[in-house]
């Protein structure tokens, strides 16, 4: 049985970049495992641990084979007919092979294959010891790490994320002889920089985590995270509040500390007059603090910082955190008060001076386009067009506020607050903020109907603009954020169950963008001509039907639908189901969703596979047809019972599903289609479609054409075929 030993590799460094640490740790761990695997060294992955702190990267494996497995090799020699001469003496071929193997030819074994009997020499190659291979494995692992900005230090030419100061390599109780980046491996690690600033001797890998903990280092990120969350929640409870803990903030703090300790802090209540989102943004993003909320979710004057030490004077640590945050809060309060002096309406007047795009006019022009689209969408989903107009008119005003200039993430949020203060209706104020949702992957869509209207109009205009001026995404470049906007648009429609004609909306958006580009061309060409926008609208806003415009709308539609591929894949929807619906190009994305749901249920039926295969066969037959197919089926030309049987069954299904299809009850329609399997099977078993009689052939093709069209009334089901 193979002997196994625990393995510990720890690379000690100066503080690693917080954002790079997770990837560095993962790559280091995976690189070591991959190096062992490439060399055939057995590893028990069940207890493998990737460990890290800001000052170290470590790999801890509880069971690693002490050597590579033995390798059994076969060296093949000559066949018998060439191994001996006519007198039965060994030829030079046999003697040379034996000499190469270092044995007498008489000791060679014989085997038989398809060509006859031949000589073979079997050897056992012992595996190399793991400790001899580890230095090379470590070097490879480090070389493969994704270091964003490698650096040199001292007089060395080594490159790494930060200077390397120590290296621990223990295999069992023994130190592995190695030198990496000028540092020799040993058993000496380091404790916490301030709480235990001295060497830590490790007897073996097994007690690594416990020994480091005694030196005030929690080397397991999961343990640090659990401690951080537990302490934050406990401190917040002490003051009767609830801590706001976001995954992003916790992940950052975990990679900033080795020995976390929660510290309760506070700020002056006067700062609570500022929109709480600005204060929260400052605490979380800029300082990595955790705000404390009351039972209603409103910000209190308390917050929690995570120190990297256990201080004897916690109050002094708290004062330091409070001193850091006060200037930022003072700035936010100043910006807020300055914005209140001018008001939301005055901010909007400056949109005329801000260029949205050289070919698309100003932000005020964009607002005008969004306003028209919002008015068109609103009545389709039961929203007052006047409210839609009002919220669109105010939607971009906060972009000219001091607050948003300082905190760009608060666009929409600031507008919400300023609209309420200005006396706007609550639903209008909420919609200004709501329209930005979803802001990121996994975020919720807009909550209010009015916010959804504005969000749809905004994204439609952005998409139409991006495509009109040639700013389509390429690779990882997406300057207009079109991919994000397309998915946000699609999610809002689908998750809100809006049965909107997407192509009509894209058509309207494209018309107004075409109008905008025309106006800009005229502005540049005729600077002295003061033509009114109203006159230009009469001249240019009439929809121009052209092949180019139709192609652009189709391109936009396809771009939006393609964003849904990943959206549904994340929900476990098979690609074949998605392709089946996408081929039909439903104009309503909510209709697309319902068809996709129905296809999922249909695919579970026992008849689904057979019908999918049949439909694929029908398409192939029709594609290869070399004669003109009649528009209708002539039942008088049938000469086989299977033909009439199929037509009767098809007509029955069409009649029975007409109402369900009109009501878009696609599950019912597809369930009904399952009844066609027996007559379809009988038709293909007993009827020769490509009959020599051209009239019979054409009529049978017409029957298959009608059948194929109805089989695809919900989705192109041949995609379900295996």
UniProtKB/Swiss-Prot annotation:
Key words of the record: Aminoacyl-tRNA synthetase, ATP-binding, Cytoplasm, Ligase, Nucleotide-binding, Protein biosynthesis
Major location (coarse): cytoplasm
One Gene Ontology cellular component: cytosol
Keyword DNA repair carried by entry: no
Pfam (any one): DALR_1
Disulfide bonds: none
Subcellular locations according to the entry: Cytoplasm
This protein's record includes keyword Transferase: no
Record's catalysed reaction(s): tRNA(Gly) + glycine + ATP = glycyl-tRNA(Gly) + AMP + diphosphate
Record InterPro entries: DALR_anticod-bd, Gly-tRNA-synth_bsu, Gly-tRNA-synth_heterodimer
EC number(s) per entry: 6.1.1.14
GO molecular function: arginine-tRNA ligase activity; ATP binding; glycine-tRNA ligase activity
BP term (GO), one: arginyl-tRNA aminoacylation
Entry-linked NCBIfam families: glyS
Family label: Belongs to the class-II aminoacyl-tRNA synthetase family.
Subunit structure and binding partners: Tetramer of two alpha and two beta subunits.
Name under which the protein is recorded: Glycine--tRNA ligase beta subunit
Organism whose genome encodes this protein: Xylella fastidiosa (strain Temecula1 / ATCC 700964)
Gene name for this UniProt entry: glyS
């Amino acid at each position: 049985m193979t002997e196994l030993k625990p393995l510990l590799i720890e690379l000690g460094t100066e503080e690693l970049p917080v954002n790079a640490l997770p990837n560095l740790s993962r790559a280091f761990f995976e690189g070591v495992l991959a190096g062992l695997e490439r060399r055939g060294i057995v590893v028990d992955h069940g207890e493998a641990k990737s460990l890290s702190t800001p000052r170290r990267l470590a790999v801890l494996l509880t069971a690693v084979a002490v050597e590579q497995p033995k390798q059994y090799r076969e060296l093949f020699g000559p066949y018998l007919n060439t191994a001996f001469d006519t007198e039965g003496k060994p030829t030079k071929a046999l003697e040379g092979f034996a000499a190469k193997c270092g044995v007498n030819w008489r000791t060679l074994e014989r085997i038989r294959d398809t060509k006859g009997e031949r000589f073979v020499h079997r050897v056992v190659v012992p595996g190399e010891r793991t400790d001899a291979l580890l230095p090379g494995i470590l070097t490879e692992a480090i070389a493969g790490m994704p270091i964003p900005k490698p650096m040199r230090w001292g007089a060395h030419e080594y490159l790494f994320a930060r200077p390397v100061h120590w290296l621990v390599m223990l295999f069992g109780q023994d130190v592995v002889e190695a030198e990496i980046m000028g540092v020799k491996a040993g058993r000496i690690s380091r404790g916490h920089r301030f709480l235990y600033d001295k060497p830590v001797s490790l007897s073996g890998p097994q007690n690594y985590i416990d020994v480091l903990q005694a030196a005030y280092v929690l080397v397991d990120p999961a343990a640090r995270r659990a401690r951080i969350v537990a302490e934050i929640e406990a401190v917040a409870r002490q003051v009767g509040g609830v801590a706001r803990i976001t995954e992003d903030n916790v992940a950052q703090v975990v990679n900033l500390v080795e020995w976390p300790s929660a510290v309760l802090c506070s700020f002056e209540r006067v700062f609570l007059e500022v929109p709480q989102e600005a204060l929260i943004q400052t605490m979380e993003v800029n300082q990595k603090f955790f705000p404390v909320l009351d039972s209603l979710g409103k910000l209190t004057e308390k917050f929690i910082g995570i120190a990297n030490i256990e201080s004897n004077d916690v109050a002094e640590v708290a004062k330091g955190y409070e001193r850091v945050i006060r200037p930022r809060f003072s700035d936010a309060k100043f910006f807020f008060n300055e914005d209140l002096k001018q008001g939301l309406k005055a901010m909007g007047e400056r949109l005329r001076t801000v260029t949205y795009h050289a070919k698309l006019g100003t932000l005020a022009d964009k607002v005008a386009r969004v306003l028209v689209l919002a008015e068109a969408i609103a009545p389709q989903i039961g929203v007052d067009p006047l409210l839609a107009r009002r919220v669109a008119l105010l939607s971009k005003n906060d972009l000219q506020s001091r607050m948003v200039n300082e905190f760009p993430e608060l666009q929409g949020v600031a507008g919400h607050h300023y609209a309420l203060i200005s006396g706007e209706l609550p639903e209008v104020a909420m919609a200004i903020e709501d329209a930005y949702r979803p802001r990121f992957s996994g975020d919720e869509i807009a909550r209010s109907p009015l916010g959804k209207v504005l969000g749809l109009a905004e994204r439609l205009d952005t998409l139409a603009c991006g495509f009109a001026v040639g700013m389509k995404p390429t690779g990882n470049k997406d300057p207009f954020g079109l991919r994000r906007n397309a998915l946000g648009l699609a999610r809002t429609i689908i998750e809100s169950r809006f049965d909107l004609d997407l192509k009509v909306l894209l058509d309207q958006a494209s018309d107004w963008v075409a109008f905008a580009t025309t106006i800009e061309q005229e502005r540049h060409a005729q600077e002295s001509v003061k033509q009114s926008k109203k006159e230009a609208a009469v001249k240019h806003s009439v929809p121009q039907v052209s092949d180019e415009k139709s192609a652009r709308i189709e391109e936009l539609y396809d771009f939006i639908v393609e964003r849904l591929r990943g959206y549904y894949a994340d929900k476990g929807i098979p690609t074949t189901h998605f392709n089946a619906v996408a081929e039909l190009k439903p104009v309503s994305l909510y209709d697309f969703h319902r068809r996709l749901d129905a296809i999922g249920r249909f695919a579970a039926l026992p008849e689904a596979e057979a019908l999918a295969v049949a439909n694929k066969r029908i398409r192939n037959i029709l594609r290869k047809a070399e004669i003109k197919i009649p528009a209708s089926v002539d039942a008088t030309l049938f000469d086989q019972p299977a033909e009439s049987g199929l037509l009767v069954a098809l007509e029955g299904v069409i009649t029975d599903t007409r109402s369900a299809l009109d009501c878009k009850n696609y599950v019912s329609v597809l369930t009904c289609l399952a009844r066609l399997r027996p007559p379809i099977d009988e038709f293909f078993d007993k009827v020769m479609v490509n009959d020599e009689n051209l009239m019979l052939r054409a009529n049978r093709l017409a029957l298959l054409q009608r059948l194929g069209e109805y089989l695809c009334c919900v989705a192109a089901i041949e995609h379900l075929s295996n």
